[in-house]
């Protein structure tokens, strides 16, 4: 329930007025102590069934804002406030935080409908898929929640298929919706399996200056295989590759991002065959474009010839009409 904000100074009455005393007392208190953030109020759709997830809305009358409960819970940049009343089962979202999340969503496009306002992101650190909550469900993304611990998160369809990722997302408590802010910078708590894999990677980096040959890389891959993390490692690599097109198409991509992507693609021997095939594709497209240009050139010549012929017909008709007029006048 929204609480009244303190009376403003210009509305304070005379000093002797009983209405003025609460206002004066309020003004004497520090602003941070007295002011309470306005909360979203719970509403239930009277025409929806009671057991459906979309019948619960939260509404802020002062800002004319309404949002589904799940859209609020699963939004990546939004958390609930400290609950002032533990007996109140309603969610505790303050209006200003919701407005900031709406503003953040204006920069994010939904992977499913391609419209802005997509504040629900895949929980995997390197995945940049964003959705509207109900679009995510249509795209077979998997919401995961623990109401007791206040954890609400979502995995896209691709990453929900892999047990290690799904397990780590299910039990890591990084996206709490009650009691603490959630980082947007990607500081995820890592499960033991991921930490083990990262330790291997760090060891490879430390050894890179001294051993750049297969004596380090081969054992690393074998250890990943023994630990059951080889698929996870490859999925991380694929996630990085899958994120490249979206980054390149984004108008806000920085020059350093272009340099990083270019280095990853052109300096990696893994893609040598890919570039050979890509060169062949370029030659094929050049040939197709040349053929199309030749066809267009022939079509243009035909149209110009047709235009000239039509002009000749028009000139002949005008001459005939003029001759007929002169003949009629001579009589």
From Swiss-Prot:
A zinc finger (C2HC pre-PHD-type) spans 42-78. Highly expressed in T and B-cells, as well as natural killer and mature dendritic cells. Expressed at higher levels in Th1 as compared to Th2 cells. Expressed at low levels in all normal tissues tested, including lung, testis, small intestine, breast, liver and placenta. The keyword Kinase does not apply. The keyword Cytoplasm does not apply. A zinc finger (PHD-type) spans 108-160. SMART domains: PHD (SM00249). It is found in: Nucleus. InterPro entries: EPHD, PHD-type_Zinc_Finger, Znf_FYVE_PHD, Znf_PHD, Znf_RING/FYVE/PHD. Disulfide bonds: none annotated. GO terms for cellular component: nuclear membrane; nucleoplasm; nucleus. GO terms for molecular function: zinc ion binding. Pfam families: zf-HC5HC2H. Keywords: Activator, Metal-binding, Nucleus, Transcription, Transcription regulation, Zinc, Zinc-finger. Interacts with BRCA1 and RELA. Positive regulator of Th1-type cytokine gene expression. This is PHD finger protein 11. The gene is PHF11.
């Amino acid at each position: 329930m929204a609480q009244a904000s303190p009376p403003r100074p210009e509305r304070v009455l005379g000093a002797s007025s009983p209405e003025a005393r609460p206002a004066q007392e309020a003004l004497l208190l520090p602003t941070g102590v007295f002011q309470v953030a306005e909360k979203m109020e719970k509403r239930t759709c009277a025409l929806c069934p009671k057991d459906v997830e979309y019948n619960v809305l939260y509404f802020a009358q002062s800002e004319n804002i309404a949002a589904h409960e799940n859209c609020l819970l699963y939004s990546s940049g939004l958390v609930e406030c400290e609950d002032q009343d533990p007996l109140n089962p309603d969610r505790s979202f303050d209006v200003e935080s919701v407005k900031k999340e709406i503003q953040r969503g204006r920069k994010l496009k939904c992977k499913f409908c391609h419209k802005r306002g997509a504040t629900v992101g895949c929980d995997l650190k390197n995945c940049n898929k964003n959705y509207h909550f109900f679009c995510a469900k249509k795209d077979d993304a998997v919401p995961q929640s623990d109401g007791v611990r206040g954890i609400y998160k979502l995995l896209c369809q691709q990453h929900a298929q892999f047990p290690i990722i799904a397990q780590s997302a299910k039990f890591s408590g990084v996206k709490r919706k009650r009691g603490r802010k959630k980082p947007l910078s990607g500081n995820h708590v890592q499960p033991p399996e991921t930490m083990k894999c990262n330790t291997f990677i760090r060891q490879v980096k430390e050894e890179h200056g001294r051993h750049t040959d297969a004596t380090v890389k081969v054992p690393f891959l074998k250890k990943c295989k023994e630990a059951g993390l080889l698929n996870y490692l490859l999925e991380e690599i694929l996630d990085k590759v899958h994120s490249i097109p979206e980054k390149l198409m984004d108008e806000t991509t920085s020059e350093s991002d272009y340099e990083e992507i270019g280095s990853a693609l052109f300096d990696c021997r893994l893609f040598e065959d890919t570039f050979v095939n890509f060169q062949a594709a370029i030659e094929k497209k050049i040939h197709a474009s040349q053929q199309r240009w030749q066809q267009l050139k022939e079509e243009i010549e035909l149209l110009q010839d047709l235009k000239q012929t039509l002009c000749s017909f028009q000139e002949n008709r005008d001459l005939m009409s003029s001759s007929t007029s002169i003949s009629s006048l001579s009589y």
